[in-house]
Amino acid sequence: MLPSQAPEATKLIVGTRSAWLAARLTVEFNNQSWVVYGYTDASKLGESRKFAAMTLKDRRQHQRDAAKKLLPGLKGALDIAAGRIQAFLAVADAEGLLHLAGDLSEHLADGVNLVHLPDILESALASLRVEKARETMGTAIRQAVRLEDYPESFRAHTRKRRLIAVLGPTNSGKTYDAFKRLAKAESGVYLGPLRLLALEAFNRLNDEFKVPTSLLTGEDRRDVARSKVTASTIEMLNPDRQVDVAVIDEIQMLLDPDRGWAWTQAVVGANASEVWLLGALSAEAAVRALASRLGLELEVHYKERKHPLTVAQNALAGDPIAALRQARKGDAWVVFSRRNALTLRDDFLARGMSVACVYGMLSPEVREREAQRFADGDADILVATDAIGMGLNLPIQRVVFTAVTKFNGEEVQRLEVPMLQQIGGRAGRYGHQPSSKGKQAKDGIVVGLTPDEHRVVVELMQAQQTPLPARGFLIAPSQAYLERLSKLASTERLEALLAAYEQHADQGDGFFRAHVPQEMLDRASMLDAMQNLTLQTKHLLAMVPLSSQHEVLGATWTDWVRKVNRDVPVGLEFLRGHPENAALDKAEMAVQQLWAYLWLSYRLPDSFPMAEDARELLEPWVEAVDLHLRGHARQGAARTAGKAAWYRPAPVRRRF
């Protein structure tokens, strides 16, 4: 249809500096009306401040007067504009772009200088073509990456499998039952969330259960002759290896926002006749949903605590200084930062008590040594962060919460029920709690430091854990997915491919959900700036276990990436000084850097060729950390007489 070229109305357009009279033009195309308010330099009415001071009545009168004078002159410009818009719409329609042109339609209706209309339409057409290409690409990606087909990408999909869920609180014997089953299996694998747990499984299966077991983590590999079982971190799952029994620990981490994808992958892809799922009762609904979706037989076994757990009737003391005097052998005092752990340790040492200390920055080897000192009675008190929530079977008689809030990376939040209950459940660990001959061992006890903390401890220890959702299981972008997307998009830019995966993968009914780990996203842009890295290498470097948030460790990662890009072998020059002279924080960083170097040496051996040297240097640096923690030198914040620098009062909920 031909456009309507007659102006039907006028509009006063007031900009930041000037004001114009615009005339309305309606263009009819394919039964749709495109409304344009157009003006020219000739229809300028003056400075905008003049109109800002007018009343609405005066504005309207001025608009009517201007229309009588200026509309005839605008008609020619409107006629030309109508033809240009008609031509634009015809091209956009032929290329299937009109459904994307909503923003342009609004822009034209708001008012446009007709002198600039050709440039506006040309730019809009180019933008619409880009948007159409993205839309087409999104459709292709949805067809190529269908998350509901995820299970079919694993060999396990073709074999008969049975899920056995063993659910219960801490100290209920779940792991012991699973280890007994692994001991009887012809072949098996243990998959845990931490290198510490894999190491514990490795040691227990070899020493306690007499099962030849190898260790396989991202950083550490120990082959044992004639091994039947492999103890591994969960990300190291080998879905192509067939085994009789696979044990997946801490199954309640299925919906963890950072690492839940690894549990989804393990449940879906573990190539075993029996897949044991160990974890909290809150995971039951999620486990049942997965079993149903995968069409697998499921057995659920419920476990009870082997040793009683009691929440103390009262807080430990009225204030933190008085609470220190109530500390006793067998206590575990819980804090939520490295600084507070070391400062509290210092205060106990000043009172003449021996202390073991465990926190997240420590390597598994040091944590295990510190835990052993406590277990052997060489340390009276254990000071720990939430790092003791998983693993580390210890003879803890009482767990003391010095805080009930934790900084989550963005803000300070109150502890969630599962975390507090899991840490509290470390008290009275089965098989470790000492008892006298013929007498029952004492209950494990959980207590808050002061009344403020204790009120929260009582509330959360009595609370029911919220069941995990039965859908929304995370799937991270595998190398195979990224290569598929790269071919479709004709690019190896990691950032673009990760965004395309998260935005366009076909998520079906939402049972499975596309997820890109934040650390990977944060690193992608810099990796794309490196000209010589393949997509596979960029993907691998994005997963290096070094925190980008830590200034020194982040700088180490950046330096390594640049050297790999230049094809320069990475040496051990990142190590500064000697372990025997290093401060605690320097020694901790050196251990983390060495483990990350070993992680990369398994994957990029040509770029990280000094693995043997790194392994030899690791022990002296681990020993340096251990010596600091076993020593009596102050490691935390400066001490202030009469004050507990490690204590922050719990927020009080006021009642109105």
Regions found by a protein language model. Give the residues of each.
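Conserved helicase ATPase core of P-loop NTP-dependent helicases/translocases
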Residues: 214-224, 343, 354-385
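Post-DEXD/H (motif II) to motif III coupling segment of the RecA-like Helicase ATP-binding lobe
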Residues: 252-307
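Conserved interdomain hinge at the start of the Helicase C-terminal
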Residues: 177-182, 258, 262, 269, ...
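Inter-Walker segment of RecA-like/P-loop motor cores
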Residues: 205-243
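Conserved segment of the helicase C-terminal RecA-like domain
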Residues: 274-283, 394, 398-462
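Interdomain hinge/linker at the junction between the two RecA-like core domains of SF2 helicases
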Residues: 219, 227, 284-327
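Non-catalytic terminal extensions of ATP-dependent helicases
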Residues: 1-145, 476-656
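Conserved strand-helix element at the start of the C-terminal RecA-like helicase core
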Residues: 187-201, 276-278, 284, 325-351, ...
